[in-house]
Amino acid sequence: MTLLAPRWLTLSALLALGATTSIGCAPPTDEEAGEEGSSTDDITQIDHTKVKRQSIGNCWIYASASWVEALNKRSTGVEANVSESYWTYWHWFEQLANGRSMTEISTGGSYGTIAGLIDRYGLMLEADFVAAESEAEMSNRQSAALAAINESLKTGALKDPAVRRNRAKVRAELDKAWGLDRTVVGRLDAVFGTGVTKTLDRSYVRNRPNNSIIRARDFDAAIYDFTTNTVKKVKLQDALGTGSYWSRSGPLAFQEVNYPSSAAARRKFQIAVQKSLHASVPVIISWKVDFNALSQSSQFSKEELDRRGPGRQGGHMTVMDDYQVKLSDGRVLKAGEPATADLLTRALDTRATVEFFRVKNSWGAIRPDRWSDAAKPGYHDLLMSYLNGPIKECVERDGHSDPTNCPGSVTPWWDAVLPAGLGNDIGF
């Protein structure tokens, strides 16, 4: 259903379940109307920014950027283009700078990973980091940089553990691989030091860093407060909260919550997600992809997967946008169509059945090589029959799943990042 807005609102596969597990993303290889006379002014929708296309396995960064951009756009009315490349740069830096043995960069991560990166390094707009890609749907710079760093790890400077223990040398290799110009390098030097002796989370960093690097505490956001049922204009740091990779705290801090196993708890979980969407709150979802479940109509379907058998698999993170639900009386509230406040209240009944959740993806807007039709370009419908599973889980070999060797099973829906006040007492 369409959640109507007032005019002022303009993964390599996971090895185990858990909110803190790193996701290595799997990019693709190449009519019910509102009731007459009913007001819809108090129903909201998520005002997403444009769809992008990942070129490497960092979907978790793209999903997080979409989440950040949506929170910011609700506050400012302006579409910010946050740099996924900037966070990717620092994710690689932290892997390389510890000097441990490695032959290639891991592109996987999680919500906890991105929250920590933002704590330490803030964010930049794409125009201020890789200006040449400020209007691009897909970053070729990321894939080129990944190839360059992996080659350096195999045959170049980064092959030497001593170099990897020298933070200034690691940064120099990254700057070269990313093709950063002197102005951008100078900005990073000024804020963090050439050897990254400073980060934004240190107690002595009290002033705004400027130099186009933005702290979370200075980046505008709007969050729905479920304790007061009001929209609050706050800062991104309020949504992130404080804490470590393992947990975040704060009165408005979002939390990563695992999808439960029992039918009753799953319905409670789904209702929490529905409430978030009703309140125009973006929700990040982590799930397992099997590309043989993807239909030409841009849906992930258990029926399609059963017909075709297991295919290439991996972890994935996306941001929710909408959903379709059958009410207890059999009426269907369709995704993309108007719904009144009364109907949405009925959609939260435990007897209502969600048919699918629609997500904003990071695989590009128009992909005739992957799907021929989509309700919204760049968005996918995840049918509950698929999300609930179970589906066959295939063994990974040489970095790829083997569809001929699938001894286990898994529930595709892993977790969601829910706003404060929701997700408590869901059960298991």
Name each model-derived stretch.
Residues 158-161, 258-358:
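Active-site-adjacent substructure of cysteine-protease-like catalytic cores
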